[in-house]
Amino acid sequence: MRKLLLIALCFTPLFSHAEGLPDLGDISQEVISPQQERQIGEQSMYQIRADKSYLDDAEIADYLNLLGGSLVSNSSEPGQAFEFFAINDNAINAFAMPGGFIGVNTGLILTSQSESELASVLSHEIAHVTQHHLARMISGQKFDSLASMALIAAAILSARSNPDAAMAAIVGVQAGGIQRQINFTRLHEQEADRIGLGILQKSGFDTRAMPTFFERLQKSSRLLEGNTPTYLRTHPVTNERIADIANRVQQLPYHPVASSLDFQLVRAKLQTLQKTPQEAIVYFNGALGTQKFGNPVAQRYGLVIALLQSRQLARAAQEFAPLRKQVQSNAMIATLAGQLRRAGAISDPNISDFFQTAAQNFPQHRALMYDYSEVLLQQKRYSDAVALLNQQVADHPNDPHLYELQARTYAVLG
């Protein structure tokens, strides 16, 4: 995890103050081309995917990329390739890397009280990428200065609770030229706020969510007495920044937006990952019993996942029945229905027909396709499995699990 934090800090602003925004120009691409930025990001992602904290969950990744993709389409660079991914870490943080790679901690997703709040953070990170902030930070320096940036990140990590100590460590690492970097990065956060807010509005989300989320984090940091959320250490939020965002929001038309069901389901699924199955069962039973907070559909969804994990199959099927009646068409719930069938919680002699119909309804839902492929392999329908997996690999060329399933299928065929 230490290595992962170093990578994150290398590509996020170090300090921030609410200042005016001079025209920084487009000097960044004179130093690092978009192709080089992508290469740097790819190399970093290679290390991140190998880290145990990388959350390899297709449903959560697909949700983040669907949400992030809708935001990118309303950015200044809608054609740029982006990849959004989750880090299994309770710390409230998100970070952008060059080339369009954006990581979000599970703690931040669970802390977001609405989809608009999560979208506001993603919009902010998208702005860091589209504005080429990393390239601006090292403009005028040699390309190999990235090595010293890693040392700077290490200094910040070791003194993250003491900004003054961090500044002293940074200057000790690279006295010449670092002050100019800091002067530029002081502007990046406010620029990302302004541009991110525009992305949020164009994408149809509640713009009030941005100042609301930042203000809540700031208040929580005061209550924690020094145990500042990680997001505030890598993206310092000042009263001036919050006031500036709030002032901009007040000039925009009010547009309340309900959170999607998928947002609620993802949060429920993350709760099951943060707890033991028994703890999750107690948690969701309590939530459903009080019926005061959260989405009851999502709470029941989380309960069924926990029951399935604990092999309480009969009760899992019992709890799933009303869920299926409440929601007629949803990829995540259809995937859970398939998992209950595969586990034997729901007896279905026509299980392949169920998966065929579900796959037709949700052809891009990778988790569903994983299970459908397994069913086809179990039924020795190898040609059907090959056809399905070849199409999925074409649609998702960076998914190693699909390649694994494809290789298993070809191995059986000889």
Where are these regions (language model features)?
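Hydrophobic or amphipathic, alpha-helical segments that drive membrane association/targeting
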Residues: 4-5, 9, 13-95, 177, ...
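Extracytoplasmic and endomembrane cell-envelope/extracellular-matrix remodeling and assembly machinery
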Residues: 24-31, 42, 54, 62, ...
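Active-site His/Glu-centered metal-binding helix of metallohydrolases
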Residues: 44, 122-134, 195
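Acidic/histidine metal-binding catalytic segments
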Residues: 60, 80, 138-147, 164-169, ...
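Short pre-active-site segment immediately N-terminal to the catalytic Zn-binding motif
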Residues: 106-120
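Catalytic Zn2+-binding segment of zinc metalloproteases
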Residues: 116, 126-143, 161
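Membrane-active amphipathic alpha-helices enriched in small hydrophobic residues
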Residues: 146-164, 168-180
